């Protein structure tokens, strides 16, 4: 009887199936296919422009106040490629897909997915400027609700796509802290059977051991901004009093600079948070 060899397509599909199960964070992100990459002839290359929502102002009264439409975008760059390269024999390809998956594909995809998740979490976490709670301590249920409030304040959609990622130790603490509160019977069963919080406070709770841990620079006090040279629209400011450069990903505020509602422009009662994207001892970008 002729050998029934596993094809590259079968191996790839199995690898993707396993990857989908192991990508705790990436699995919650937008993965809509963009056919710009499928164009024949002129390709878009490694960069994809993502259009941002247009912003307008509201007039009061009957007089027309026409305004220009200025579309803005951000660029998504395919900058990092990762893979697990391995050798296997034609004999391996004659095995059943389940056996081949367990022996070869699954271990390879496990380490690849873990590396991809860690890289992505490190990257995106350093770009996030909204923060609640006390660093280094288990967030309380009230603080988690404050995080949800931050999403509301910046107009994040109120749907089932809101997720919270926690390491197992923190998840265990949350399960213990929430065990006495009212829960939907289906969700509370997950705490006792699986040791994880299901869907609570409008969030889907997910365990993830690759959470990025941020470390501030050695000098985080006494840094002041040069307000004399600052101008509207600046994303880099001169600083003084820094003995070492602030760490990329550190969050800071500026006196009298308040957060505002994105649409009404009415100021919130709290200061706007910013995140360091680049820094030296004399300047800081955000």
Regions found by a protein language model. Give the residues of each.
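Autoprocessing Asn-cyclization modules and mimics
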Residues: 173-286
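N-terminal "assembly arms/tails" that initiate or stabilize quaternary assembly
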Residues: 1-74
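Short alpha-helical segments and helix-capping/turn motifs at coil-helix boundaries
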Residues: 30-37, 143-151
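Threonine/glycine-rich low-complexity segments that form extended coil/beta-edge repetitive scaffolds
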Residues: 66-72, 76-78, 235, 252
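Short, well-ordered loop/turn elements at secondary-structure boundaries
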Residues: 44-45, 158-160, 247-248, 270
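Long, contiguous amphipathic alpha-helices that act as assembly "spine/axial" helices in icosahedral shell
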Residues: 50, 76-143, 152-170, 192-207
């Amino acid at each position: 009887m002729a050998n029934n060899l596993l094809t590259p397509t079968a191996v790839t599909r199995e690898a993707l199936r396993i990857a989908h199960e192991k990508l705790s964070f990436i699995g919650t992100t937008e993965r809509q296919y963009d056919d710009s990459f499928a164009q024949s002839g002129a390709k878009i290359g490694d960069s994809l422009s993502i259009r941002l929502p247009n912003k307008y102002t509201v007039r009061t009264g009957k007089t027309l106040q026409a305004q220009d439409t200025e579309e803005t975008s951000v660029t998504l760059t395919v900058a990092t490629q990762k893979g697990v390269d391995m050798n296997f024999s034609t004999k391996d390809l004659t095995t059943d897909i389940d056996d081949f998956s367990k022996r070869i594909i699954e271990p390879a995809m496990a380490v690849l997915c873990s590396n991809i998740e860690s890289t992505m979490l490190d990257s995106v976490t350093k770009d996030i400027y909204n923060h609640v709670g006390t660093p280094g301590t288990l967030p309380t249920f009230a603080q988690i609700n404050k995080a949800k409030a931050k999403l509301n304040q910046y107009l994040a959609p109120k749907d089932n796509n809101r997720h919270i990622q926690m390491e197992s130790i923190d998840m265990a603490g949350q399960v213990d802290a929430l065990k006495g509160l009212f829960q939907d019977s289906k969700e509370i069963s997950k705490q006792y059977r699986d040791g994880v919080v299901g869907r609570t406070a409008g969030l889907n709770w997910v365990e993830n051991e690759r959470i990025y841990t941020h470390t501030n620079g050695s000098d985080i006090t006494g840094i002041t901004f040069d307000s004399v040279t600052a101008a509207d629209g600046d994303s880099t400011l001169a600083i003084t009093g820094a003995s070492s450069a602030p760490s990329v990903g550190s969050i800071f505020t500026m006196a009298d600079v308040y957060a505002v509602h994105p649409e009404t422009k009415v100021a919130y009662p709290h200061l706007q948070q910013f995140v360091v994207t680049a820094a030296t001892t004399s300047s800081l970008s955000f």
